[in-house]
């Protein structure tokens, strides 16, 4: 794959909630992260704000538009997209300088970990969402394809932006709405520069195997039979013990 130069700027702002008590003891701590990057040769960037690991908003660089993770957030705050565009321009200029100073040495590739799971317990015929969680990777470039029965799916898919981690790696979520069926199976295929080949994670509906009633009856009858045998054997051993003791007592009486 093509060589990549990546500049990732992360600014951490710690908002500390102080107790109103006289001791002013720290009761809780929250973190707001402003994460931005610019990538080459893709010539694209990302600008977003994160609160305690959840996205607040990101800026669509191409559309110069602020996209709030939840629409309700826009009622209480605002952010001018032009500010993000100005930051990305600075990132690009800094990246050019860093490329020269590093003799065009690319950043290291860290392959992702991939997990596929459902949003909620799966029941046949009830709509659900599959989640493809891509974690601990760098640089922030991945190609993700959903497959149903081995064929690409493009409808009902969505995704998050690249989300920062405390260790300067990234994570990302991809979603697929689906109707659970025993006839369908799904795969999330992830391609990243840290992988030798695309990585697939498989998911299919697994029906809970309940013990048939006939088998239950057999097992119950077998258990009852074993119990009865144990009781009979126990009674026989007790009778033999009593008989043996009586014989010994009669012999001792004769003496």
Curated annotation (Swiss-Prot):
Return the annotated region ranges for Connecting peptide: 204-216
- Membrane spanning residue stretches: 217-242
Ranges for domain Ig-like C1-type: 112-204
Where is this gene product found? Answer: Membrane
Extracellular compartment segments:
26-216
Question: What's in the GO CC field?
Answer: external side of plasma membrane; late endosome membrane; lysosomal membrane; lysosome; MHC class II protein complex; plasma membrane
Record's signal peptide: 1-25
User: Which region ranges are annotated with the description Alpha-2?
Assistant: 110-203
What protein name is recorded for this chain? H-2 class II histocompatibility antigen, E-K alpha chain
What species is given as this protein's source? Answer: Mus musculus (Mouse)
The root-end lineage is:
Eukaryota, Metazoa, Chordata, Craniata, Vertebrata
